[in-house]
Regions:
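C-terminal segments that line or cap access tunnels to active or ligand-binding sites in enzymes
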Residues: 102-219
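Helical element adjacent to the flavin cofactor pocket in flavoenzyme catalytic cores
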Residues: 1-50
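A glycine-rich dinucleotide-binding beta-alpha-beta segment and adjacent secondary-structure elements
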Residues: 136-140, 199-200, 204-268
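A conserved FAD-binding loop/helix module that cradles the flavin
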Residues: 264-286
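Active-site-proximal substrate-binding core of FAD-dependent oxidoreductases
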Residues: 32, 38, 287-299
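Hydrophobic, well-ordered secondary-structure elements that form the walls
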Residues: 60, 97, 163, 202, ...
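Flexible, glycine/charged-enriched surface loops at secondary-structure junctions
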Residues: 26, 30, 208-217, 292-296
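Mid-domain catalytic core of redox enzymes
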Residues: 34-155
Length: 299
């Protein structure tokens, strides 16, 4: 995007954590939620996969619409929602590239690159989904370390890049019953093939990094599924199409009392959309226009 947090994306969480602690909150990690506990159509807490129950007066889900109502809400009569009106967003591959040498030594700039085979972007996507052996529909190349003014102080003589492209979930569906790092040789061979295809675009547009690669790691839609809980490995939750924005039920309030929604499915996709959804959900809970307060404090 147009802004980059000093210290990288982790700085966002690290800046929020003290506020949560100071107001009496608690952050729990490595605690996977199995179920939102519903009693008489009222959310009263969550149940973890280890069986532990955490009771609360409110439950706010940022797990996404699909995950929330297809996996976490397990009551016999789930809310009547027009789920057929929303679709998952596209799945993706992300190649994480570690480099020997600083951005300055390698001549890297912070400008993002968007690489397309031609100007008909819709046709590019349709062609690739129909035949994944054709040209990649798009390759987006980003330079996180170049954008971070604290990078060299914290990480020395290194630099990073990311290269992202679309990838239909069906490419990997044969391995959906497997676990991370235990998917087998065929899966690893496919990852290597895709890594090489992406790197051809990288070398074509950032040729000076050739010979300076220290690490390559490719995430697939299955990686996204396993770490973020999106069943189709979608990159941005639900598809943010015109039809999605016609759905009036996509809002913080739900038909289950004390169960609220937040995250990019409620506002729009990306980091900024997810952050603003927190403000919108807070406004709904407090019944107060918190957005005005935020704008007043930042103006």
């Amino acid at each position: 995007g147009g802004n980059y947090p000093v210290g990288g994306s982790r700085s966002i969480a690290e800046s929020i954590a003290p506020v949560i602690h100071e107001t009496g909150g608690k952050i729990i990690v490595n605690a996977q939620v199995d179920e939102i506990i519903i009693h008489r159509n009222r959310a009263v807490g969550v149940k973890l996969t280890n069986g532990e129950e955490l009771r609360s007066s409110l439950v706010i889900s940022s797990a996404g619409i699909t995950t929330t109502f297809s996996k976490l809400v397990k009551q016999s009569s789930p809310p009547a929602l027009n789920m057929d009106k929303v679709n998952p967003s596209c799945a993706h591959l992300c190649l994480y590239i570690g480099l020997k040498g600083t951005a300055e030594k390698l001549g890297l700039e912070g400008t993002n690159l968007w690489i397309y085979p031609d100007y008909d972007h819709d046709a590019n996507v349709e062609r690739f989904i129909a035949d994944t052996s054709t040209n990649l529909a798009v390759v987006y190349i980003s330079f996180p370390s170049t954008k971070d003014p604290d990078w060299e102080e914290n990480h020395g003589d290194t630099a990073t890049m990311e290269a992202i492209t679309l990838a239909p979930y069906d490419m990997f569906s044969k391995w959906e019953g497997t676990d991370w790092k235990k998917r087998g040789e065929d899966y690893e061979n496919l990852k290597n093939e895709l890594t090489n295809r992406i790197m051809r675009s990288v070398y074509a547009h950032v040729p000076q990094v050739e010979g300076h690669i220290d690490h390559l790691e490719l995430s697939t839609p299955l990686t996204t599924r396993d770490f973020l809980g999106y069943s189709q490995g979608e990159i941005y939750g639900i598809e943010h199409s015109p039809e999605r924005f016609r759905q009036k039920w996509l809002r913080p309030q739900t038909s289950i009392k004390n169960l609220y929604l937040t995250g990019q499915d409620i506002v729009t996709d990306g980091v900024a959309g997810a952050l603003m959804s927190g403000v919108v959900t807070t406004s709904a809970i407090l019944r107060k226009n918190v957005i005005k307060d935020v704008l007043r404090r930042t103006s």
